[in-house]
Curated annotation (Swiss-Prot):
Keywords: Aminoacyl-tRNA synthetase, ATP-binding, Cytoplasm, Ligase, Metal-binding, Nucleotide-binding, Protein biosynthesis, RNA-binding, tRNA-binding, Zinc. Binds 1 zinc ion per subunit. Residues 215-506 are annotated as: Catalytic. Zn(2+) binds at C307, H358, H483. Belongs to the class-II aminoacyl-tRNA synthetase family. One of its GO terms (cellular component) is cytosol. It catalyses: tRNA(Thr) + L-threonine + ATP = L-threonyl-tRNA(Thr) + AMP + diphosphate + H(+). It is an enzyme of class 6 (ligase). This is Threonine--tRNA ligase. Transmembrane segments: none annotated. The keyword Hydrolase does not apply. Its main location: cytoplasm. Catalyzes the attachment of threonine to tRNA(Thr) in a two-step reaction: L-threonine is first activated by ATP to form Thr-AMP and then transferred to the acceptor end of tRNA(Thr). Also edits incorrectly charged L-seryl-tRNA(Thr).
Length: 609
């Protein structure tokens, strides 16, 4: 049996240092030193402190802000300058790791000391960053954790001894604004990870290296899909011809699926009066994420979501219960303010397009429509090779509507999943400000989880906009509004798909499906004939006929990760055939042109949405 490093009491993780002082504990669950989710939270949080201890030993002038455990590891934000006046860089990580290992070998006890806030403030009176931390802590008892000469204000939990922190790795150095405020100073942030054993650490590091090779920003540049430009602005992607072709194919496929499932296309404006956002609650609850402007002295907000426009479509006619459910969808371009430090390629941008839909239905229709959406999600994700899991996110601290309405909406989601045997987790407080939601989290080839699709049940916006329908008794009733996205956003989903496939995109959305390479000019007319036949199948192709060697042109096609390469020479022209290199199957073959076109048709028909 491995060592106990903490306990779980009433759903909260309590370290061994704190557990000793608890009284009348009835249901305490041991947390052992292993790679369970709870154990890793404790190990990684403690490793953040260990890193800070090492940094302080190497750089006595260092000041520390916060160092939490995060999903895949930990980080610490701090201020330090080296003797040459520079900030720490990646080249300094090895020395920090070496010092951390010294403290691990020393097997230092980690002690918890509790005191009053004023006493702690006095102890750290010369540390401006710790004073910033104290501002965020309510009055009362404050805890400090101590290991060796290092002390830090912290709630815990932590392992009891540094000996439990042997399997760690510092991964990267970044900058982070103090408290996430872009107007404050830039601190240094070092990220790391930790596990309970060497095997899991090595596997994580292997995946990390593979992720670098699959970085969608690098592959996107190699495949000429998209770019970013400082003159345009951060978080504003520019789609190049290859990327625009791929994206349009994805949009076209989804458009057809929506129509077959009974959705009506609509389109709302991208800029709305602030009055509309005040009614919806966005002005109060989401304003910091929005962009505003003035037109003729009237304040307008650029939409961060599409829901208000779809509400206005609903209100354009008198609705009957016979009309419901009404399903409106839109590829809606939205803008949200993201801090510069969190933007990352296509994953976090300021302008993006949602595959957004809103379903207006009667309360009795909630379950059937939620299940229809889940079936939609299942079809899409399986066609792209993703597995997924679901999580119900409940009422956040900042929300509109009363608790009773939230309870009804949350229970409607739970019942839809429970009655059909779906497994799901609970994310307490993770809902949208207007309603609870089901988050769809997909798992990629590197076993990373990404939140993409979402289903939200909303009683609040229909009430705020006084939506209604006439029921079978000729009485006016309020509909329920289901907010729904399958991909989440095209930008984010495409970024995930690029990394999931390492750029080897499915044939049906590949920007260029076939590269045609005539060996010399005598074969060019036949190449054009093949290209025309492919165009009739709606397959994009390119002819690589530059005055370059055959091998160089083949390498160009391979660098672009084109699924199929055709080499055309004298034999192919004479026999009306093609020499096919199938990149995805890693196979070469010779086919007649008719056989090849039939092969392409079959490839296109392999997916069924």
């Amino acid at each position: 049996m491995s060592d106990i490093i903490a306990y779980k009491v009433d759903g909260e993780i309590v370290d061994t240092q704190s557990f000793k002082s608890l009284k009348n504990v009835k249901n305490a669950e041991e947390i052992y030193f292993d790679n369970s989710e709870d154990a890793l939270k404790v190990i990684r949080h403690s490793c953040a402190h260990l890193m800070a201890q090492a940094i302080l030993a190497l750089y006595p002038n260092a000041k520390f802000f916060v160092g939490p455990a995060i999903e895949d590891g930990f980080y610490y934000d701090f201020r330090v300058t080296k003797e040459n006046g520079e900030k720490l860089g990646k080249e300094d990580l090895q020395a920090i790791e070496k010092k951390m290992k010294e403290f691990i070998d020393a097997k230092e006890e980690i002690a918890k000391i509790c005191s009053t806030k004023s006493e702690i403030a006095n102890e750290f009176k010369n540390d401006d960053l710790k004073q910033e931390v104290l501002k965020r802590i309510p009055d009362g008892e404050v805890s400090v954790y101590k290991q060796g000469d290092f002390k830090d204000i912290c709630r815990g939990p932590h392992v009891p001894n540094t000996k439990f922190l042997r399997f760690f790795k510092l991964t990267r150095v970044a900058g982070a604004y103090l408290g996430g405020d872009e107007k404050r100073e830039m601190l240094t942030r070092i990220y790391g990870t930790a596990f309970a054993d060497k095997e899991n650490l090595n596997e994580y590091l292997r995946i990390l290296e593979e992720a670098k090779k699959r970085d969608h920003r690098i592959i996107g540049n190699e495949m000429k899909l998209f770019t970013f430009d400082d003159q345009i602005g951060a978080g504003l992607p520019v789609w190049l011809p290859n990327g625009a072709r791929m994206r349009s194919k994805l949009e076209k496929i989804l458009f057809g699926v929506h129509r077959r499932r009974g959705y009506e296309p609509v389109r709302g404006p991208e800029i709305l009066k602030a009055d509309a956002w005040k009614i919806s609650g966005h002005y109060t609850n989401y304003k910091e994420n929005m962009y505003f402007t003035k037109i003729d002295e009237q304040e307008y907000g650029i939409k961060p979501m599409n829901c208000v426009g779809h509400i206005k479509v609903y209100q354009s006619e008198i609705r009957s219960y016979r009309d419901l459910p009404l399903k409106f969808f839109e590829y809606g371009v939205v803008h949200r303010h993201e801090k510069s430090g969190v933007m990352h390629g296509l994953f976090r941008v300021r302008e993006f397009t949602q595959d957004d839909a809103h379903i207006f239905c009667m309360p009795s229709q909630i379950k059937e429509n939620v299940l229809e959406i889940l079936d939609f999600v299942d079809k899409i994700m399986k066609n792209f090779g993703f597995s997924y899991e679901m999580e119900i996110s409940t009422k956040p601290e900042k929300a509109i509507g009363d608790d009773k309405v939230w309870e009804i909406a949350t229970n409607a989601l739970k019942e839809a999943l429970d009655e059909n045997g779906f497994k799901y987790g609970i994310d307490e407080g993770g809902g949208a400000f207007y309603g609870p939601k089901i988050d769809i989290k997909i798992t990629d080839a590197l076993k990373r989880k990404w939140q993409c699709g979402t289903i939200q049940v909303d009683f609040n916006l229909p009430s705020r906009f006084d939506l209604g329908y006439i029921d079978e008794n000729n009485e006016r009733k309020q509909p329920v509004m289901l907010h729904r996205a399958i991909l989440g956003s095209f930008e984010r989903f495409i970024g995930i798909l690029i990394e999931h496939t390492a750029g080897e995109l499915p044939f049906f959305i590949a920007p260029t499906g076939v590269s045609i390479i005539p060996i010399n000019d005598a074969h060019l007319n036949y190449a054009k004939e093949v290209q025309k036949a492919l165009a009739n199948l709606e397959v994009d192709s390119e002819i690589l006929s530059k005055n370059e060697t055959l091998n160089k042109r083949i390498r160009t096609a391979e660098k672009g990760r084109v699924p199929m390469i055709l080499v055309l020479g004298d034999n192919e022209v004479k026999n009306r055939s093609v020499a096919l290199r199938d990149r995805r199957a890693r196979a070469q073959s010779n086919l007649s042109l008719d056989e090849f076109l039939e092969f392409v048709k079959n490839k296109l028909n392999e997916v069924n949405f």
